[in-house]
Amino acid sequence: KLNLENMNLALNKLKKTYKIYAPKVFEGAGTFSDTDRVRYGEVSTIEEIEFNEKSSYSYKETILPIRQTLFFFTEDDCKEAEVDERPALIFLRSCEIHSLKRIDDIYLRNGFEDIYYKKMRERAKFVLIGCEKSFENCFCVSMGTNKTDEYNAYIKVDGQDVYLDIKDEEIANIIASIEKEEKEVTPDFVKENEVNVNIPENLSLEVMKSTMWNEYNERCIACGRCNFVCPTCTCFTMQDITYKDNKNAGERRRVWASCHVDGYTDMAGGHSFRKEKGQKMRFKTLHKVYDYKKKWGYHMCVGCGRCDDICPEYISFSTIVNKLEGAMNEVKNND
């Protein structure tokens, strides 16, 4: 247990070793005029960290940048881009720690290791922010991601007091000289959400035949927001950029991509696997709650609810999931 002043002293010491990322308020950066946005950024003090609101974007952008230069090239040479070697200390919630396992599956355990992600992942440590209450649209309890013990440290702020549970030896050693009171600290976890989802046990690819997907041909505007705020979406595209002053030199960038946006499945000859918006919604939904579990043994979705929070058309992913049982019955009756 520390007071706020001593916690800031601890952060100051940690900042000499780590880049510290946490959800913080960006004033005036909201969707509407004179509104704020909570997303991840570097912090130096405990007061900067936003504990009481869910961040609009997940921690994902701290270890998987929205835009990342992989290498530079000329006519004769190719040079890998340098990576900031400083380790990172990232504050995040239980559902997001679970999502980290999903990103690791894709980039580290999916046939080969992605060296660019691996470099950033290996230098990251994670501080769990407890959830005393559920936020709007969260359904982490249904997805089994409301609890975790996979953290390097845990933090809770209660008024002028800060409670820490530190598992990582390096972090403990760095702040060992800070004045503190020894106490037993147990993380806060949500026990129930206002939103619950039911994923049918008999869910199969037959649900693709359901008419439920047609609704999203009209409602979805293919903006891709749901993918970009999601802590488990991992798709990207490649961009080769050449410089104006030398067309024979440039760089290759990896940039986040969205399975909802036009062009995602385009192939040579103008062909595309999924042209209708409802087909794209079906693909994303089944990836999150069907085929991923077939391969890895658990669902990709962690129930953070950000897709529901951000959708400009008020499409609710949790509602889509809860429609699947009816869709399976529809297909069964039609057969």
Region roles according to the model:
Residues 24-25, 232-234:
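Short, well-ordered beta-to-alpha junction loops that form the rim of enzyme active sites
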Residues 199-218, 236-335:
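Ferredoxin-type iron-sulfur electron-transfer modules in oxidoreductases and energy-metabolism complexes
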Residues 1-204:
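Iron-sulfur-associated redox domains of electron-transfer enzymes in respiratory
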Residues 220-231:
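Oxyanion-binding "anion nests"
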Residues 6-10, 226, 255, 316:
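General structural feature for long, well-ordered alpha-helical segments within catalytic domains
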